[in-house]
Amino acid sequence: MKTYLVGGAVRDSLLEIPVVDRDWVVVGAAPSELTALGYQQVGKDFPVFLNPKTHEEYALARTERKSGQGYTGFTCYAAPDVTLEEDLQRRDLTINAIARSDDGELIDPFNGVADLQARVLRHVSDAFGEDPLRVLRVARFAARFAHLGFSIAPETAELMRQMARSGELAALTAERVWKETEKALQSQSPQVYFQVLRDCEALGVLFPEIDTLFGVPAPAKWHPEIDTGIHTLMTLAIAAQLSPEVDVRFSALCHDLGKGQTPKELWPHHHGHGPAGVLLVEALCRRLRVPNPVRDLAKLVAEYHDLIHTVNKLRPETLLKLFDAVDVWRKPQRLEQMILTSEADARGRTGFEDNPYPQGDYLRQAFQVANAVSVKEVVASGLQGLAVRDELKRRRQQALAEWKQTQDIPLDQA
């Protein structure tokens, strides 16, 4: 029985980036041998065991054979006669098919080290095409390692395109699509994930609401990049610089979905695209089973991001309506998330990437002014019921009106 460190741990150590999880392959052993050593079996579909001391995963070397549709349609064979090379051959990319023995020797039958050095994402074998989830995984790796200069090998990109055209992506469950997408949104360059999916024709299958935005023009005066799809990915890239939160990044991705519904005869203008986008965000999130907090922020951003761009022109009562809609009194973090997403929208335009966004500080200060009005004082004044609400609103409007007279910020239109 021999054990080897495999997969991401070997890859990341060779890239000299932090190793998060360590996975092991066991060659030449039966399940009974591992359980006798105190290992606990956790895998249902194939033998995976937890080390009793480290709690790291140890999997018996195995092969996989396509037996049905989708990413679950595989028959697994795990036995002592399965070799390390056979186990590595079933993996998706050459950079993930490198093993390291106990003495530090690298076992690299598919030239993964060379691809690491060349910064290339390349599939191990044609078996890659049997698992549609791998299209998303490669797109995610492209996003994760984009800052290191990685690109997808042409033959791998072509195979991904063939897979997208085959209809197999339809077999992916909503949970798996969202899981890969969520990981991609957490990467340093999440916009690359969606660009890769578009390049291999998978975006229209999995995210038609986003794919539709490409080719939809916006006024060149405000959007020199013109194409709404390009603007969307630029906005996502800026959002990734501003916040690590998936909620903010997903909202940036979805902020202009409504523009995809504008009739062509009205191009390049998109009046009312905010409310139209809310329905599309709702449909997208329902289909992919996006968590409710992520969905709720994306809907708010879709509806109100244009209003935030013009915040210094809003009347006190309109500001309060915005605060109420966002439920900022109970969820103040939402306001900051919306500000960051709106800033990403304003800066996600050719030539505007480094521009300031004074609307953000203006809105932060406006909330501080309104929130400083004491609820306790209103209650202590003897008012009851709806009269408390009305008086609180009146005092907040008055405070905002007085504060607004001291403010003067330049206005840009996104």
Swiss-Prot record:
Query: What InterPro entries is this protein classified in?
Result: CCA_bact, HD/PDEase_dom, HD_domain, NT_sf, PolA_pol_head_dom, PolyA_RNA-bd, tRNA_CCA-adding_enzyme
Residue ranges occupied by any HD domain in the UniProt entry: 228-329
The record's remark on the cofactor is: Magnesium is required for nucleotidyltransferase activity. Nickel for phosphatase activity.
* SMART domains found in the cross-reference section: HDc
What is this enzyme's EC? 2.7.7.72, 3.1.3.-, 3.1.4.-
Biological processes annotated in GO:
RNA repair; tRNA 3'-terminal CCA addition
Chain residues that bind Mg(2+) = D21, D23
Q: Which reaction does it catalyse?
A: a tRNA precursor + 2 CTP + ATP = a tRNA with a 3' CCA end + 3 diphosphate; a tRNA with a 3' CCA end + 2 CTP + ATP = a tRNA with a 3' CCACCA end + 3 diphosphate
Question: Listed disulfide bonds for this chain?
Answer: none
Q: Which GO terms describe its molecular function?
A: ATP binding; CCA tRNA nucleotidyltransferase activity; cyclic-nucleotide phosphodiesterase activity; magnesium ion binding; phosphatase activity; tRNA binding
Q: Which residues take part in binding ATP?
A: G8, R11, R91, R137, R140
Cofactor(s) listed = Mg(2+); Ni(2+)
For the ligand (CTP), the binding residues are: G8, R11, R91, R137, R140
Keywords recorded for this protein, A-Z: ATP-binding, Hydrolase, Magnesium, Metal-binding, Multifunctional enzyme, Nickel, Nucleotide-binding, Nucleotidyltransferase, RNA repair, RNA-binding, Transferase, tRNA processing
What does the further note read? A single active site specifically recognizes both ATP and CTP and is responsible for their addition.
HAMAP family (alphabetical): CCA_bact_type1, CCA_bact_type2
Its quaternary organisation is: Monomer. Can also form homodimers and oligomers.
Q: Which family does it belong to?
A: Belongs to the tRNA nucleotidyltransferase/poly(A) polymerase family. Bacterial CCA-adding enzyme type 1 subfamily.
Entry function: Catalyzes the addition and repair of the essential 3'-terminal CCA sequence in tRNAs without using a nucleic acid template. Adds these three nucleotides in the order of C, C, and A to the tRNA nucleotide-73, using CTP and ATP as substrates and producing inorganic pyrophosphate. tRNA 3'-terminal CCA addition is required both for tRNA processing and repair. Also involved in tRNA surveillance by mediating tandem CCA addition to generate a CCACCA at the 3' terminus of unstable tRNAs. While stable tRNAs receive only 3'-terminal CCA, unstable tRNAs are marked with CCACCA and rapidly degraded.
| Free-text comment about domains | Comprises two domains: an N-terminal domain containing the nucleotidyltransferase activity and a C-terminal HD domain associated with both phosphodiesterase and phosphatase activities.
- Protein name, per record: Multifunctional CCA protein
Q: Which organism is it from?
A: Serratia proteamaculans (strain 568)
Task: Name the gene for this chain.
Answer: cca
